[in-house]
From Swiss-Prot:
Cofactor note: Binds 1 Mg(2+) ion per subunit.
Annotated residues for binding of 2-[(2R,5Z)-2-carboxy-4-methylthiazol-5(2H)-ylidene]ethyl phosphate: S139, P140, T141, G169, V189, S190
Membrane-crossing residue ranges in chain numbering: none
Gene source species: Thioalkalivibrio sulfidiphilus (strain HL-EbGR7)
Keyword Transit peptide: no
Annotated catalysed reactions: 2-[(2R,5Z)-2-carboxy-4-methylthiazol-5(2H)-ylidene]ethyl phosphate + 4-amino-2-methyl-5-(diphosphooxymethyl)pyrimidine + 2 H(+) = thiamine phosphate + CO2 + diphosphate; 2-(2-carboxy-4-methylthiazol-5-yl)ethyl phosphate + 4-amino-2-methyl-5-(diphosphooxymethyl)pyrimidine + 2 H(+) = thiamine phosphate + CO2 + diphosphate; 4-methyl-5-(2-phosphooxyethyl)-thiazole + 4-amino-2-methyl-5-(diphosphooxymethyl)pyrimidine + H(+) = thiamine phosphate + diphosphate
Protein name: Thiamine-phosphate synthase
Needed cofactors: Mg(2+)
MF GO annotations: magnesium ion binding; thiamine-phosphate diphosphorylase activity
EC numbers on record: 2.5.1.3
Reported function: Condenses 4-methyl-5-(beta-hydroxyethyl)thiazole monophosphate (THZ-P) and 2-methyl-4-amino-5-hydroxymethyl pyrimidine pyrophosphate (HMP-PP) to form thiamine monophosphate (TMP).
Keywords: Magnesium, Metal-binding, Thiamine biosynthesis, Transferase
Residues engaged in binding 4-amino-2-methyl-5-(diphosphooxymethyl)pyrimidine: Q41, Y42, R43, D44, K45, N73, T112, K142
Source lineage: Bacteria, Pseudomonadati, Pseudomonadota, Gammaproteobacteria, Chromatiales
Length: 211
């Protein structure tokens, strides 16, 4: 596995896509990073650009302080402006090749592949750094999402040479099964950010990758 691939392992925290005070978001993100998140993805589809840039810069600084990777969801231009480590793209977002041309060879680009291994193989061939499958469990973030079964992660781990991320309804009480099935990362939204003690929940999740 490449050096980038070695860094793509562990708890991958994703900010909730709901209106949130930037200081509250920053405080919760810092707690999650203290708890051991290795990556932090900023996802906000509703705020205006100035607010998103302000939040992204604050989160980027936190990641720098804690030695974590900072990823921006969808918005390649914003990722460039704030110096993010990379972007996460959905199937309907900017084509991977175009994003790579804008961000450069060193940027991390992840691709959502839902429950389809064929999409993951195509993403790998196109130069993706990781792929994400989900929803693994019922998700409050995307209640209508197609489910990705646990055996998919085992098959993906045997087939792909890039890291595999699991997303969708994951929390500390159910993450062990998908990690055992082959996920290199677990992307968690409400399972950390919506908890009374985000740091403690992040610590529980991060510890699952240390055994």
């Amino acid at each position: 596995m490449t050096e980038t691939g070695e860094r793509l392992r562990g708890l991958y925290a994703v900010t909730p896509d709901i209106p949130t005070d930037i200081e509250d978001l920053r405080a919760r993100a810092e707690a999650v990073l203290r708890g051991g998140a290795r990556l932090l993805q900023y996802r906000d589809k509703s705020a205006d650009l100035p607010r998103r840039e302000q939040a992204a810069r604050a989160l980027r600084a936190l990641c720098e302080r804690h030695g974590a990777l900072f990823i921006v969801n969808d918005d390649v231009a914003l990722a460039l402006r704030v110096g993010a480590h990379g972007v996460h793209l959905g199937q309907q977002d900017m084509p991977l090749a175009e994003a790579r041309a804008m961000l450069g060879r060193e940027a991390i680009i992840g691709i959502t592949c839902h429950e389809r291994l064929d999409l993951a193989l195509s993403a790998q061939a196109a130069g993706a750094d990781y792929v994400a499958f989900g929803a693994v469990y019922p998700s409050p973030t995307k209640p209508g999402a197609v489910r990705a079964p646990l055996p998919l992660f085992t098959e993906a781990r045997e087939t792909l040479s890039i890291p595999v991320c699991a997303i969708g309804g994951i929390e500390a009480d159910n993450a062990a099964a998908v990690i055992a099935a082959g996920a290199d990362m677990v992307a968690v939204v409400s399972g950390v950010f919506a908890r009374p003690d985000p740091e403690a929940e992040a610590r529980r999740l991060a510890a699952m990758f240390e055994v």
